[in-house]
Structures are given as C-alpha cells and as structure tokens.
Amino acid sequence: MTNIRKTHPLAKIINNSLIDLPAPSNISAWWNFGSLLGTCLILQILTGLFLAMHYTSDTTTAFSSVAHICRDVNYGWIIRYMHANGASMFFICLFLHVGRGLYYGSYMFPETWNTGIILLFATMATAFMGYVLPWGQMSFWGATVITNLLSAIPYIGTSLVEWIWGGFSVDKATLTRFFAFHFILPFIILALATIHLLFLHETGSNNPSGIPSNSDKIPFHPYYTIKDILGALLLALMLMMLVLFSPDLLGDPDNYTPANPLNTPPHIKPEWYFLFAYAILRSIPNKLGGVLALVLSILILAIIPLLHTSKQRSMMFRPLSQCLFWLLVADLLTLTWIGGQPAEHPFITIGQLASILYFTLLLILMPIASIIENNLLKW
C-alpha cells in the first residue's frame, strides 16, 4: 500500500513541496531565506493577531492602547516588540533573498522573480501602514509625508491624496483604513507567497553554479528541512536578542510622543528599511521626479532579466560582475545611511552621487561588465 503522504490530496501537496521535493545538492545557506521569510510571515501574522485583539484604531485611543498592551496585557510587551522587530528581521531576510537572486541569476525564472517583486511591494506597503498605527509623532508625520507624495501625480494627484486620507488631512478615517489594510495585506502576501512557490516548483531551484542540476538532485527532507530549522533557530536567536536586550534600537524616539498635527518633528524619516529609497527620493529636487525615482528604485528589478548580457547565469565565475555587485551593496548601505541624515550639505551631494551610482550600476555598468567577461572567455 502506498503511503498516505503520497496519495491524500492535501498531504500530497505538502509532500511535493516540503518532503519529496527534488532539490539541487549544492545550494548554500543563501537559499535559506525563502523559508525564513515564510517563518517571519507566520510570526508577524500571529503576533499581529494578538495585538489586534487589544489595539483600537481611533486617533484618541490608538497611542494609549499600544501603551496599554505594553503595560497591562500579559506578555503584551514581548508580543509588541516581537512584531515591531519581526518586521526588521523580515526586511533583512527580504534584502538578502533579493540580493541572492541578483548574484546567482535567479531572476532567469521570470514568473518567480515577478511575483517576488509584487511580494516586495506588498510587504513594503504593509510595513508602512503598520508604522502609522501606534499614532506617535513619526507615525503621523511619516503618513503625511509619504501619502502626500502622490499629490505629485499630474491632474489627479490632489484628489487621490484626499481620497486616501478620507478627508483633508491624515486623521481618524486614515488611521482606521490603514488598520484595515494592515490587517488584510499579510493574508494577501501569504497567497502571493504560495503562488511564488508554485512558480518556483515548476522550474526547480537554481543553484550557486547557475548550471542545471537535474542530474544531481536530493530529497528536500531530511537534508534541507534540518538546514531550514537551523536557519529558523538562528533567526529566532537574533530576533529575541533584539526584543529582550534592545527592543527600541531600530525604532525612532519620536514615536514615543503622541501624534500632534501642530508640531512637526525636526527630522522626519521612515523606518531603517525604507531609508535607501527615501534617500533616492530626496536626492532629486523635483517632487514628481523624486517620486518616480523612488518607485523605479524597486521597479528596476523587473527589467533585470532583460539586462542580463552574460553567457553565464550566476556571478560565481565572473569576478568583474562580482566587484560591481559588492559595489552596489556598499552603495545601498551608503544610501541607507544618507536617508537617516538631515537634508543638508554634504549629505545631499553624497545622496545624489549614490543615487546616480545605483541606477548606473544596474542599467549600464553591470551589463557592460558581462559583455567584457564574455569576450575575455572568447564566447
């Protein structure tokens, strides 16, 4: 008799995705981040659910309801900080996951790559709206500044912003709808992640060499289940160190001041994981130009497969491309630093140079480097 695992309609799906899945024998720890992102998502949904049981999405009580969660709810403080820092861990995993895809040429699976880009946008939208919910100073002003960017869209901009706000400023209606969207989006992300995985399993995983590995596959369980569990334990260790030792390390002190529309904080800045995009936005003096650059800084990922000029898929054996890749990483770290600095000299100039370098690397230098490498190998 065949094992129920292989015959039952539901068990069969799980079996083919997590147990008997043929996986390349040489995938490194950089392939752990998919499962870690799944772990983060489940953690965020669970902690978020428990927070939603005690949170009130009303401008008069939102701030105090978060304080109530931290002070009066049993283990409310740990749930709140796991949720806040869980978002940071989520984005660390996301950036590493995307970076892995760029380095090893995983973008050559277009469906998987494109659903991944949609997932990235959905996650960024969710995180932004979540940051507004505690209704501190940075929540309020962050929401005001970022939503106001849409007013740069010609003709419909102003109407669009007022439609999103539900009034003439960020107020009760805005907070209520942001809470509703923040609650529903993770479930949409979960559905998109399932589609992402479905597309991945159509082609099978890529591997560090970028060479098809059909001739050398091993079962996912036990080899990669144990590897994923180790990854999850390390993720949990990092998260709990953040939560228990320095829960406010990545937050903004201004968010411990209740939202006040009459008092603007000296430096309005988003959470650390948006700073690179914020720096690109600020480096262009024109409002519409800045908004376009902001969107394109992420949307540029969609044309990466079209810019692939190399005869090899992975960067593993391409030293010139490797140098440019790590230059891109350094550039993104520079942009992240600049995004957190006030908009004054010399930070403005550094931000502009880093923004130019970011787009130049992806659109011009990396494709040229690939062509040079092809010629060096006489291909």
Curated annotation (Swiss-Prot):
The chain crosses the membrane at residues 33-53, 77-98, 113-133, 178-198, 226-246, 288-308, 320-340, 347-367. Heme b b566 binds at residues 97, 196. Keywords: Electron transport, Heme, Iron, Membrane, Metal-binding, Mitochondrion, Mitochondrion inner membrane, Respiratory chain, Transmembrane, Transmembrane helix, Transport, Ubiquinone. Disulfide bonds: none annotated. Its cofactor is heme b. SUPFAM superfamilies: a domain/subunit of cytochrome bc1 complex (Ubiquinol-cytochrome c reductase), Transmembrane di-heme cytochromes. Component of the ubiquinol-cytochrome c reductase complex (complex III or cytochrome b-c1 complex) that is part of the mitochondrial respiratory chain. The b-c1 complex mediates electron transfer from ubiquinol to cytochrome c. Contributes to the generation of a proton gradient across the mitochondrial membrane that is then used for ATP synthesis. This is Cytochrome b. It comes from Lutra lutra.
